[in-house]
Amino acid sequence: MSTPRTAEITRNTNETQIRVAINIDGTGQQKLNTGVPFLDHMLDQIARHGLIDLDIEAKGDLHIDAHHTVEDVGITLGQAFAKAIGDKKGIRRYGHSYVPLDEALSRVVIDFSGRPGLEFHVPFTRSMIGTFDVDLTHEFFQGFVNHALVSLHIDNLRGANAHHQCETVFKAFGRALRMAAELDPRSVGTIPSTKGSL
């Protein structure tokens, strides 16, 4: 591989200070410190199952709640991914994954289309996972989608345990990312679109 697909993005606002460094062609190494333990756990799933190296440091207004931190980590990760993947030449573009965890099953499908769109259908069985508000899962993915410029479909097909539901979503997301971002040796240097650009 001639050019490393890496990026580092810093985002500072009155609400959060975030730094994200990624290597799309990594091995799943991670260093995560967002101040939101459950978010760190979910980001670890993305790294491990996507084989993406992630280094994320975040400080936010957690004295209010975790909303700004979770959303802004999604935004910054999306920006980093867009920068690292570059012009998208040679990538597979589309990725999908089904992931089970005991009784839970989720499907994630992604398209590096250049157009942001999120379909999020996760009927969580409770509103909190420990101290984590499950509504923030949607905010994370909306932030990612808007800044990575991808079309993302997330469906939890079944599940009784909210932790399992959420974990299958993040694992499937990591695996779908890996598939879509993978370089196809049969289309080196080619944009995977009849338009010639994405």
From Swiss-Prot:
List the CDD domains hit by this protein, alphabetically: IGPD (cd07914)
GO annotation (BP), single: L-histidine biosynthetic process
Q: Which InterPro entries match?
A: IGPD_sf, ImidazoleglycerolP_deHydtase, ImidazoleglycerP_deHydtase_CS, Ribosomal_Su5_D2-typ_SF
Q: What class of enzyme is it?
A: lyase
Family listed? Belongs to the imidazoleglycerol-phosphate dehydratase family.
This one is known as Imidazoleglycerol-phosphate dehydratase
Single GO cellular component term:
cytoplasm
Q: Which gene encodes it?
A: hisB
Q: From which domain of life does this come? A: Bacteria
Catalytic activities = D-erythro-1-(imidazol-4-yl)glycerol 3-phosphate = 3-(imidazol-4-yl)-2-oxopropyl phosphate + H2O
